[in-house]
Amino acid sequence: ISPIAWQNDDLPELTKEYTMEQALQEAREIGYTGVERGQRMPHDTEGLKAYLENANIELCGGWCSGNSLVNNFPEECEAIGQQVDQFVELSSPCIVYAECSNTVQGEIQTPVNGRPKLTRDEISSYASKISEVAKWCADRGMPMAYHHHMGSIIETEDDVNWLMDASSSDLNLCFDTGHLLFGGGDVMATLDRWGDRINHVHYKDCLLYTSDAADDSLR
C-alpha cells in the first residue's frame, strides 16, 4: 500500500494531521506487509532501511520522478540511479516510474486538460527511450513499473496502449484504476489487454461526477 492513502503529497494541508508513523502502524494493523516509499520517510538508504524495520514493514515500491522525455539516456540513468540502487538494496519488487517533464499534476491552478499531449508517433518515439531506461533498471536488478498519471503525457487509455504497443517487454505497467478511470479509460479492457505486463497495481476509486464536472469545466 502507499502512504498517499493517508497523506496527500500534492495538497499536504489536507492530511497534515496524519503522521507517517500512524500510516505505517495502521497499514500493519490492516494486514499489509509492504509500503511504497513516502515523501515523509528518510530518503537515505540506511535511514530508510532502519525506519521500515522499526515499523516491521517492507518496501514494496515507490514513486520515481522521471524525465526521459527531455533527458538523454545517460542523463536519465544518472538522475534516477541513486533511487534505483536504493530500491535494489532494500529488495523492493519494483520502482514506480512516472514521466514528470512538463506534467501539470502538481500545478494546482492548472486544469489537468492543460497537460502536454503527444501524438501516437511522438509516444512511439518516447517508448523507445523509456524502454532503454527500463532495461537499464532491470539489468541492475530493479524492474520498472510505468505509472500512467493524470496531468502527464501518458494519461488516457490510448496513451497507455500506444506506449505499451511501442515499448519493449522490459517496460512493465503500474496499473492505476483511479487514474485510468478519471482519464476516461476502460479499466477492464486495459487490464485484459496488458495484464501480462502489469507488475504493480494501484487500486483507487474515482468519483465519476467529479471527473465529469472537471471535464465540463474544461470545455
Placement of each model-derived feature along the sequence:
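N-terminal pre-domain/capping segments
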Residues: 1-93, 121, 128, 138-142, ...
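Active-site acidic/histidine proton-transfer and metal-coordination neighborhood
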Residues: 74-175, 182
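A short alpha/beta connector and helix-capping loop motif
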Residues: 185-203
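Non-cysteine beta-strand/loop elements that form the S-adenosyl-L-methionine
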Residues: 1-2, 95-98, 197-207
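Conserved protein kinase catalytic core
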Residues: 9, 42, 153, 182, ...
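Histidine/acidic-residue-rich catalytic or RNA/ligand-binding cores of hydrolases
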Residues: 156, 184-188, 211
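Conserved small/polar residues in nucleotide/adenosyl-binding loops
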Residues: 209-216
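Active-site beta-loop-alpha junctions enriched in small/polar residues
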Residues: 4-6, 38-40, 64-67, 100-102, ...
